[in-house]
A protein has these predicted regions:
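A feature for loop-to-transmembrane-helix boundaries and adjacent hydrophobic helices
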Residues: 1-248
Length: 248
């Protein structure tokens, strides 16, 4: 069982890197901060623009330093198209028909950049020798970087468990580090889940989301592991007795 105690150190650090990956992919996003602190996750809307408008090379969002409302920074938005004259008419027609509908006009669960201007959205085209660019203003939604909160949490847990194991390895009871991992990871996760957007729609009707509900029994399991040195062995025994007939 000492192997499991060591494994949780690597698992904690691995979870930290997974959450960093989620951050860069704009996955498992946090709720709006409703303040001027936060992160605007632009990757999802960049993908949508690429799929809705033709000949897009890349999309850039730049903070203007101004705010539409508290927690909603105004972004200078540039869409760079392929620079070929024969494509221009199709690009202009697509922008005229679709641009004001690509961005949502209000905050929803997964909206990160919105267009509160709707029909009054002002945009302009600019051509240089190297590129053909569409420029307009959009409004970002400041959100909690919940992935980074969780990554930092797991990293601290991993380092803490390693230090404890390195200093007290000869005196640690089997299951003690495993229990400590469950206690810290799932107690902190319970609170971090509270600032994440729900992952599936049915969670909207729940008082606690699924991440919080799953954290409760795992926290209790960690409590059991931590205070009972023979806990893992007992769990295995109960598991065996449940699925297999003793007489057989």
């Amino acid at each position: 069982y000492q192997v499991m105690d060591r494994m949780v150190i690597a698992i904690a650090l691995g979870c930290a890197f997974i959450r960093i990956g989620n951050f860069f992919n704009s996955e498992i996003i946090g709720k709006p901060t409703e303040s001027n602190y936060g992160i605007v996750f632009t990757q999802p809307i960049e993908k949508k623009i690429n799929s809705q408008l033709p000949f897009v090379k890349h999309v850039n969002f730049t903070a203007s330093g101004k705010y539409y409302e508290l927690g909603k920074p105004i972004l200078q938005t540039s869409i760079v198209f392929e620079n070929n004259l024969y494509m221009e008419d199709r690009i202009r027609n697509s922008v005229e028909k679709r641009l004001k509908y690509i961005l949502p006009n209000k905050i929803s669960t997964y909206s990160n950049v919105i267009n509160p201007y709707q029909g009054s959205l002002d945009y302009s085209f600019h051509r240089t020798k190297d590129k053909f660019v569409l420029r307009f203003k959009s409004v970002g939604i400041n959100r909690h970087p919940a992935q980074l909160y969780e990554a930092l949490n797991y990293f601290i847990i991993g380092v803490l468990l390693f230090l404890i194991w390195n200093k007290h390895r000869s005196r640690l009871r089997p299951g003690r580090l495993l229990g400590l991992f469950f206690l810290i990871a799932f107690s902190t996760r319970f609170f971090i889940e509270g600032i994440k957007e729900n992952q599936v729609s049915f969670e909207n009707s729940l008082y606690l989301n699924m991440g919080q509900l799953l954290s409760i029994p795992l926290f209790l399991l960690g409590f059991y592991f931590f205070y009972n040195g023979k806990s893992i062995k007992k769990i295995q025994q109960l598991w065996t007795e449940f699925f297999f007939d003793k007489k057989s």
